[in-house]
Amino acid sequence: MSISLLNKLSMNQFQKRIKQFSEERDWGQFHNPKDLLLGIVEEIGEIRNIVKWEQDIDKLRKVLNDNKEKLEDEIGDIYWFLALLANGSDINMDEAIDKVIIKNQSRFPVSDVKSQHTNLYLGGKDKQYQ
């Protein structure tokens, strides 16, 4: 399957492709939940390394833009590990995404949170904790 076709896959189709890729290489034996989670953390850490110590929002945006290819690669790796974790846990990523969207629409109604943060410790609103 070409890269251009991968861009048009649903998350569930992506999951199936990752599963096939892994099975062809007999890598399932290495894909325990702990190591998959550590893989996600590692990839997030690689993104963190791009922006660490910088506080200025404009500089942060610039460094991310200047390193867009690296950021894209790390985000792709995160999705890869998430697909492996979802496959091993029998979770359909399309369904999981739909559920979280529905949950967050109820949890954060536009009328309550538009242009407001949701950090309860700083006075934000979150219906889950009210």
Describe the predicted segments one by one.
Residues M1-I75, Y79-Q130:
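Flexible "arm" and connector segments at domain edges
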